[in-house]
Amino acid sequence: MAISRSQLVKELEPGLNALFGLEYDRYDNQHTEIFDTENSDRAFEEEVMLSGFGSASVKPEGVSVDFDDATEAFTARYTHETIALAFAITEEAVEDNLYDKISSRYTKALARSMMNAKQVKAANVLNRGFNSSYTGGDGLELFSTAHVTTGGNVKNELTTAADLNETSLEQALIDIAGMTDDRGLKISLNGTKMIIPVNLQFTAERLMKTSQRVGTADNDINAAKSMGMIPQGYVVNNFLTDTDAWFIKTDAPNGLKHFQRTPVSTKMEGDFETGNVKYKARERYSFGWSDWRGIFGSPGA
């Protein structure tokens, strides 16, 4: 259905002082604070988690050396989606509008819609991260207290869900440092950045920026700050839906990823019979994760 003069009645008459509702600032590219972006040239991308060897053992004199097997643990797949939106304007609506170039106005609105869809899809990886209906390559949700590995269960979620505070933050950092690889070997892993909804920005500011402990009369230092435990600080994501869930991105490679299959593009064409002009925006991409060790989370208490 095309935008016609009947939908733009006031714009056909003189005396209108202002048009408003499409000039708001928008939140752009917040996904880049969470996901590592790579390009893709195929319908989907797959990444395989490798399982190496267990810890080496003592070889007694004269006894054969132990052999171990390496294998593939699981495969993470990113299937690209096509995101698109279009609108049409009648020839008469373009001709009779008295105030601005109507096509320019709505192509900007189209760009806002495309950007909003991308940010929602990106944030949904975290929004659905505690939901067992949305699983990754290992068959479990992104955040779990029992990711199954050859060397035993490993967690990237607090054992007891907790709101963001000094105690829960320190426990999360301890748990991150205690993670192991698929064979149970210790790995060097650290938190790099906290990701929070807008509701937690004041709590995060106090926890991350004050030099002394928050909410206590003790003259103790703020250990997380003085030790530089989260060097990139915190970022607010306005598309997170759980007001008390919080997350810590780690320095594990191949964690959360965004594959760009086709950058956003726009097309315009006229219809000879009706005179309508059609505008379309289109983009292809995917969001997901390969190694769940790339992020740690708590759904809040």
Predicted regions, residues:
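Sequence/fold signature of self-assembling virion shell proteins
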Residues: 2-10, 143-182, 188-193, 199-301
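Alpha-helical scaffold segments that mediate packing/assembly in large oligomeric complexes
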Residues: 97-105, 112-175
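Glycine-rich, often proline-containing surface loops adjacent to acidic residues and nearby aromatics
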Residues: 81-96, 151-153, 188-191
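Assembly/oligomerization interface modules of large self-assembling protein complexes
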Residues: 25-83
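Short, well-structured alpha-helical interface segments that form or flank functional binding sites
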Residues: 82, 97, 101, 105, ...
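An acidic- and aromatic-residue-enriched active-site/binding cleft used to recognize and process polar
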Residues: 90-94, 115, 122, 126-130, ...
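Short, charged/polar micro-motifs that form catalytic or ligand-binding hotspots
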Residues: 43, 73, 77, 92-107, ...
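N-terminal alpha-helical "arm" segments
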Residues: 1-27
